[in-house]
């Protein structure tokens, strides 16, 4: 699977919000705050959780007031408090797993809190939308210097998503998508349209590209011509 896009699937999030009236957006892993700022302009309430204080402080300065609840701390301790404040189903964007550099994870030897996050969300009585960044990291062992033992397999992730619920689950554009059954058709159509567009673009590029076998055929013909002349 190639990495088609990085970051939250904003078009899909907006479609889900419009169709089902989601008013709250929760993000784990704030980083520079771009996703939180985007969501803050579209949702009534946004929570974003960041464990690294320097990253948290830098992001918070971009929008210190308003409907974004900037939260410093480990998602394991912060998520239950967020869930207590929700009054309806919400959209979760889970991106707190370590992605290298200065982001949280390596120093604490805590690269991926995903299974704990899913257990907390699934313990809630509501039926939330869950979007997980970096599907490639679970479909196959992540690249070095990540520790393989710190990362759950895709099977473990799917089993956790199915706890106390029966979501529709797909992987699209490096994102694991788990939605309530009421949103199945919307997500399926979204993925099919995106896949169709990508396939047509690929076909168009191939049709516009000169045949790769033509230079080889010409070289072969020249060699044969040279051999014929030598034989004569």
Q: Which residues does each PLM region occupy?
A:
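A short alpha-helical cap/connector motif
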Residues: 1-91, 97-232
């Amino acid at each position: 699977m190639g990495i088609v896009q990085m970051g939250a699937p904003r078009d899909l999030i907006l479609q889900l919000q419009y169709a089902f009236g989601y008013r709250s957006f929760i993000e784990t892993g704030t980083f520079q705050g771009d996703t939180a700022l985007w969501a803050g302009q579209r949702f009534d309430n946004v929570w974003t959780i960041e464990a690294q204080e320097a990253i948290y402080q830098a992001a918070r300065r971009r929008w210190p007031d308003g409907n974004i609840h900037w939260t410093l701390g480990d998602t394991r301790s912060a998520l239950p408090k967020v869930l207590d404040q929700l009054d309806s189903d919400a959209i979760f964007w889970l991106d707190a797993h370590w992605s290298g550099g200065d982001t949280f994870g390596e120093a604490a030897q805590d690269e991926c809190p995903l299974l704990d996050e899913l257990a907390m969300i699934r313990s809630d009585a509501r039926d939330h939308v869950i979007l997980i960044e970096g599907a490639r990291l679970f479909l196959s062992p992540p690249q070095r210097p990540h520790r393989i033992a710190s990362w759950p397999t895709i099977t473990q992730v799917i089993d956790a998503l199915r706890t106390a619920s029966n979501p529709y689950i797909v992987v699209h554009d490096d994102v694991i998508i788990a939605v309530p059954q009421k949103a199945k058709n919307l997500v399926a159509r979204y993925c099919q349209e995106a896949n169709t567009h990508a396939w047509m673009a690929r076909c168009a590029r191939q049709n516009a590209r000169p045949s790769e076998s033509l230079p080889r055929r010409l070289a072969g013909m020249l060699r044969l011509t040279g051999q014929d002349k030598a034989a004569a």
